[in-house]
UniProtKB/Swiss-Prot annotation:
ATP binds at residues 597-605, 619. This is Probable LRR receptor-like serine/threonine-protein kinase At4g20450. Pfam families: LRR_1, Malectin_like, PK_Tyr_Ser-Thr. Its EC number is 2.7.11.1.
Length: 898
């Protein structure tokens, strides 16, 4: 009876397996492209694999078709049909396939390259990209260069990666790196289950996929579809000559295993002839620093006697125990993954050992193994909405540019012609900020798709053949500050909303060379009555000339009056008091601008003296731009009403005609950046001084956030804006971008993004929502600068942004790789670790994960006390918060504390 039950069980397994194979043979979700196959040829089914291949012509807009010239007669290799033709790319630096995929689904992506001397030229070498990220280098010039499936690719190679797309579109790009021509024979995508090849980050680049047999590999030993329902390519691993092959005709139950292992793989193995021997295998990888993920597939394929036991331990690289005791399941597939920060040896060699335990009577073995390298894809793709919109625009105008392939914005060296993009953090999707389609040969009306580029700041459509009206939606694009429509055939009136924005200095609008008028009523001036109006043109022109002359005279008169006294009408909101200086007085203070101290985006800063004994720094606005005046006014208004020991003091200002000047107290030790990585970094700051500067800056910022009413957000915290007096006391400066923020139930201000690259809060950058936590992020970046003396952005590092770089280094747990070596280890490690943890919490990508400035200020004071106690004194450090520090206010400008 037991035998009958076993037969029934095995029969059910076979039925299930056959059903699985039939279901899988429909190749649902498979993408199989025969690259170079003409568009007009019909799809076909390859005889040897049963796979349905079709032309790649609908998935790429460039390249030419070629056919291999030779097959390897010596080895008897006969390439399957998809690998006999190819697509090569003699033009363009980057050529990309664009494929529609299922977002969030894991795909096996395979690219096959069979050279076959198709062009009778030099074998090529080029790069392969997955979206905007480097995948691998294809090197057919090196005969030993990583040809994995050599038995069936004698004149080529294949690359595989398991990748989960983050959108419904996937770009696979071939990038020219030298003088040779990139090409590809086949591109194959296979959807996989999401519970098999998993990673917390990155994708899995295939190194090897083996099953173990004693015979040397042959063409027939390659196993793929239809045996493998996922079309994985399995190559035989030539086992030790002293091993013995075993196999079974009894079906192995693979239904309990998510990997859907083929019967042709899991029913075979090779074991040591001596039961006490260790089962070992070794292989090499190109980069020893890569994390390696290994999947070991087992099944007991021998009918064991009651007295038999097969038990062994699994060791990685001779010393890391993966399993102390493991026994394969009898006629059932099982997988043991090794994927926790596993690395090979320093020489790039990896090893796996299966060692028999004392209680085992049978030798160990492994049926099959897959080895992957972790491929970190750090650069995010351009915002999906922007990409979709841009492709709609491309289709509307039939734009054909050689480099309009792949991701529009990244990598930066391949940015599409006519675009500028924001690309501040690799972890944040770039956004399209500028379009310059001048002289693109555009025809038709201005497409409404443009309005969906909601981060667009500049739009240049000049010198095309555009017709129709100027659309109203341009005035509703909140960030748009420049529009050039010159040199087209646009007609009708310009929307009044756009004209109002231009009049108020909110936008630059260029529209000459069109049939446009400035009066909305001109659109109705058609029909018979229009001839009478034309008779009035000479009269109106004469009247207009007289009007212009009068207007010019009035304007000259106004300008002369403005030179005599400052304007008050347009600047009435600025506080006017005794600290207002004339430009002549400024010239006296600076001794005719004799001694420049530095130059920045605002203008030049000069040294000066007030009352012959008080040194000051005089900042002169370089030109009277609208934005410059706005920042000037914001800074004066703020500094006239708030006073704090850690905020720079405004001595006075000048607002006279075109002359805008700010006069500050003189900070003799410059700014913090100069002492960390600039001209003064040769005399490094001690850890104590660094902590004091950080704590004092935090106190000034805390005061802005909770000591003012309305509370203020600085928006431009950076080491260059932290000034140091003769005692190295820190004072926060440059308040031109500062904004008040709401209290009560409102949590943020929606505003255009402003700030400095590297210091800018990524959440604010992404959402346009400004909160006090945006300042906290910027301060966290400064604190990392203070600890490391590293630049905020450095493209030569493993991670370009300082926050990502420190996080990367922290995974090794060695603080010495992070701390500024110029401190020579002279610091209290506990205070430094606490400051480092605080900095990393400040630069959390999510504002909800950041502390507020009061918490930051208090923790820095504790760090400072710890450091001072190590040195045996407090060194004049006061642990009070910034609100308890000595402050002074004019009687009419006392801010309310919340």
């Amino acid at each position: 009876m037991e035998g009958i039950h076993k037969l029934i069980f095995l029969a059910l397994i076979w039925i299930f397996l056959i059903t699985n194979i039939v279901d899988a043979q429909d190749q649902q979700g498979f993408i199989s492209l025969d690259c170079g196959m003409p568009r007009n040829e019909s799809s076909y089914t390859d005889e040897s694999t049963g796979l349905n291949f079709s032309s790649d012509a609908d998935f790429i807009s460039s390249g030419k078709s070629g056919t291999i010239k030779t097959e390897d007669s010596d080895s008897g290799v006969k390439y399957i049909k998809p690998y006999k033709q190819l697509r090569y790319f003699p033009e363009g630096a980057r050529n990309c396939y664009n494929l529609t995929v299922m977002q969030g689904t894991h795909y096996l992506i395979r690219a096959v390259f069979v050279y076959g001397n198709y062009d009778l030229k030099q074998r090529p070498k080029f790069d392969l990209y997955l979206g905007p990220n480097f995948w691998t280098t294809i090197n057919l010039q090196d005969p030993s260069g990583g040809f994995y499936y050599r038995i069936w690719l004698q004149d080529g190679t294949v690359e595989e990666v398991i990748h989960m797309p983050k959108s419904n579109n996937l770009d696979i790009c071939l990038v020219k790196t030298g003088t040779t021509t990139p090409f590809i024979s086949s591109l194959e995508l296979r959807p996989l289950r999401d519970d098999t090849y998993t990673t917390t980050t990155g994708s899995l680049k295939l190194i090897s996929r083996w099953y173990f047999r004693k015979p040397f590999p042959t063409l027939e030993s390659i196993i793929r579809h239809p045996d493998d329902v996922h079309d994985r390519l399995w190559d035989v691993y030539h086992a030790d000559e002293e091993w013995t092959d075993i196999n079974t005709t009894t079906p192995v139950n693979t239904t309990v295993n998510a990997f859907d292992l083929p019967q042709a793989i899991i029913s075979k193995a090779s074991i040591p002839q001596v039961a006490s021997d260790t089962w070992s295998t070794t292989w090499s990888i190109q980069n020893p620093d890569d994390d390696v993920h290994v999947y070991l597939h087992f099944a007991e394929i021998q009918a064991l006697k009651p007295s038999d036991t097969r038990e062994f331990s699994i060791l990685w690289n001779k010393n890391t125990i993966i399993r102390d005791y493991y026994s394969p399941l009898e006629f059932m597939a099982d997988t043991v993954p090794i994927r926790t920060s596993s690395k090979c040896g320093d020489d790039g060699f990896c090893s796996l050992d299966l060692t028999r335990t004392k209680s085992s009577t049978l030798p160990p073995y492994c049926n099959a193994m897959e080895v992957f390298g972790l491929l970190q894809l750090l650069q995010t793709e351009t915002d999906e909405n922007d990409v979709t919109t841009l492709k709609n625009i491309q289709a509307t105008y039939r734009i054909q540019k050689t480099n309009w392939q792949g991701d529009p914005c990244v990598p930066i060296q391949f940015i599409w012609t006519g675009l500028n993009c924001s690309n501040m953090f690799p972890s944040i999707p770039p956004r399209i900020t500028s379009i310059d389609f001048s002289n693109f040969g555009l025809n038709g009306t201005i497409t409404s798709d443009i309005q969906y580029l909601n981060q667009l700041q500049k739009l240049d459509l000049s010198n095309n053949n555009l017709t129709g009206k100027v659309p109203e939606f341009l005035a509703k694009m909140k960030l748009l500050t420049f529009i050039n429509l010159s040199g087209n055939n646009l007609s009708g009136s310009i929307p009044q909303s756009l004209l109002n924005m231009e009049k108020n200095g909110l936008i630059t609008l260029l529209y000459n060379g069109n049939n446009l008028c400035l009066d909305p009523s001109c659109e109705s001036e058609t029909g018979p009555g229009n001839n009478k109006k034309k008779l009035l043109v000479p009269i109106l022109a004469s009247a207009a000339s007289v009007g212009i002359i009068i207007a010019v005279l009035l304007l000259v008169n106004i300008l002369l009056l403005r030179k005599k006294k400052p304007s008050k009408a347009s600047r009435s909101s600025m506080v006017a008091n005794k600290r207002s200086y004339t430009y002549e007085e400024v010239a006296v203070i600076t001794n005719n601008f004799e001694r420049p101290l530095g130059e920045g985006g605002f203008g030049v800063v000069y040294h000066g003296n007030v009352n012959d004994n008080e040194q000051v720094a005089v900042k002169v606005l370089s030109e009277s731009s609208a934005q410059g005046y706005k920042q000037f006014k914001a800074e004066v208004d703020l500094l006239l009403r708030v006073h704090h020991i850690n905020l720079v003091t405004l001595v006075g200002y000048c607002d006279e005609g075109q002359h805008l000047v700010l006069i500050y107290e003189y900070m003799s030790n410059g700014n913090l950046k100069q002492h960390l990585s600039g001209e003064n970094s040769r005399s490094p700051l001690s850890w104590e001084n660094r902590l004091r500067i950080a704590a004092e800056t935090a106190q000034g910022l805390e005061y802005l956030h909770i000591g003012c009413k309305p509370p203020m957000i600085h928006r431009d915290i950076k080491s260059m804006n932290i000034l140091l007096d003769n005692n190295f006391q820190a004072k926060l400066g440059d308040f031109g971008l500062s904004r008040s923020f709401p209290v009560g139930s409102e949590t943020h201000v929606s505003t255009n993004v402003a700030g400095s690259p590297g210091y800018l809060d990524p959440e604010y950058y992404r959402t346009n929502w400004l909160t006090e936590k945006s300042d906290v992020f910027s301060f966290g970046v400064v604190l990392l600068e203070i600890i490391t003396s590293q630049p905020v952005i450095d493209q030569t590092r493993e991670k370009s942004h300082i926050g990502e770089w420190v996080g990367f280094k922290l995974t090794n747990g060695d603080i010495k790789n992070i701390v500024d070596p110029s401190m020579n280890g002279d610091y209290d490690s506990s205070s430094l670790w606490k400051a480092l943890e605080l900095a990393m919490s400040c630069v959390s990508p999510s504002s909800s994960g950041r502390p507020n400035m009061s918490q930051v200020a208090n923790e820095l004071q504790e760090c400072l006390l710890t450091e001072n106690s190590r040195k045996g004194g407090r060194h004049d450090v006061d642990s009070k918060s910034s609100l308890e520090q000595s402050t002074s206010f004019g009687p009419e400008h006392i801010p309310d504390a919340r």
